A protein has these predicted regions:
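Single, function-defining residue in the core of a domain
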Residues: 1-45, 64-65, 69-72, 79-81, ...
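Extended, structured, electrostatic nucleic-acid-contact surfaces
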Residues: 41-55
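Short, basic interhelical loop/turn and adjoining N-cap
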Residues: 52-67
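Non-cleavable N-terminal signal-anchor transmembrane helices
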Residues: 57, 92-94
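Short Lys/Arg-enriched helix C-cap and helix-to-coil transition segments
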Residues: 75-89
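Short Pro/Gly-enriched beta-strand edge/turn motifs at strand-loop
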Residues: 106-111
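Extracellular beta-strand-rich solenoid/capping regions of secreted or surface-exposed proteins
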Residues: 114-116
């Protein structure tokens, strides 16, 4: 079964969610409300969300939803995310090597409730598979812990044939050693003041990795890259071109923050924030799978606008789900 229509993807995603596990706010309705909040551009807070829902036929209290965000196990949302990831992986033939840029982004927490707990930001780390255009496992860490401390978790994100591509924030000899011990290939930009020998190798502590230098003539910038990818697999020129694909994850962060509210955390607790982040990434994966009429184009923002127009005909996602896919109610 090939998923490319919005109803088909939603049906595949939500059909197994229970509708009778909670008396007031069942799991399917809980997830549907979150999708409404992310997909509707005019909603910027939970109060906005529930004002719309309560005036269009969905009788659930904001307090009930807020309590569910605080107490419910986010595994049900994680299950939806990994269900889509598994489908995308199966739909793409495996390649010998896949470039996987990885990076961290900071999500500010604006509520004073978080400040009182000592949290002013959440750090999100993931990879972006350049073959499937899908994100990988997520690291969600409150506080200011540096991303370089998540080396082992980052390695577990990568597919077996993945090449980790990272920026200078991840340049560390200890991290390089961890990659080497784990037989994980990497291409990571290093600082220009690092020293290397006459054969363009730097010692990591347990091994040596080669250094590649390339420049951007227009910007007058030189890049120094450390890699353990053998030269017979990727030449210096290919390493330079591979590093340029790291920019794709920066574009991802920009899209998620501009269009899917990654920088607007609506929940007032860390459990709810984890749920919102996963819903945002689920919507991103839906957009990657979705095929829309040609007039909307092939860019993600065009696909998102198409979904918003479709849903708006039924006022919001909850109503659309109940009317367009009634078999999910059975």
């Amino acid at each position: 079964m090939k998923l490319n229509s919005f109803p088909g993807i939603v049906n595949f995603l939500l059909k197994d969610l229970p509708t009778n596990d909670y008396p007031v706010l069942n799991s399917r309705l809980f997830c549907s409300i979150w999708f409404t909040g992310i997909l509707d551009k005019g909603i910027n807070s939970l109060r906005d969300l529930f004002y719309q829902l309560n005036h269009t036929g969905t009788q659930v209290d904001l307090s009930t939803f807020s309590k569910a965000n605080k107490t419910r196990d986010p595994q049900i949302i994680l299950g939806l995310y990994h269900k889509l990831l598994h489908y995308i992986e199966k739909a793409h033939p495996e390649k010998k090597l896949v470039l996987c840029p990885f990076d961290a982004t900071v999500i500010p927490l604006m509520s004073k409730l978080f400040w009182l707990q000592g949290h002013r930001q959440v750090k999100l780390i993931t990879t972006l598979n350049q073959d499937t255009k899908s994100t990988g496992h997520l690291i969600i860490s409150p506080g200011q812990k540096h991303e370089i401390n998540f080396g082992e978790e980052i390695m577990r994100m990568l597919p077996e044939n993945g090449v980790a591509v990272g920026d200078r924030g991840f340049c560390s000899r200890k991290l390089f050693d961890k990659f080497i011990e784990n037989n994980t290939l990497f291409i990571i930009r290093i600082k220009s003041n690092w020293k290397w020998d006459e054969n363009y190798h730097i010692a990591t502590g347990k091994d040596k990795v080669r250094v590649i230098c390339f420049g951007n003539v227009q910007q007058k910038i030189e890049y120094y890259l450390a890699t353990n990818v053998p030269e017979e697999i990727m030449s210096n020129e290919e390493i330079g071109e591979a590093y340029k694909q790291r920019w794709a994850i920066e574009v991802l962060w920009k899209f998620l923050k501009m269009h899917l509210k990654l920088d607007k955390m609506m929940s007032k607790n860390l459990n709810g924030i984890t749920i919102q982040i996963y819903v945002i990434l689920i919507v991103y994966l839906i957009l990657q799978l979705l095929k829309v009429p040609q007039m909307y184009g092939s860019k993600l923002v065009g696909k998102l606008r198409y979904i918003q127009i479709v849903i708006r005909r039924e006022l919001n996602f909850v109503n659309w789900l109940n009317r367009v896919i009634p078999r999910l109610n059975m």
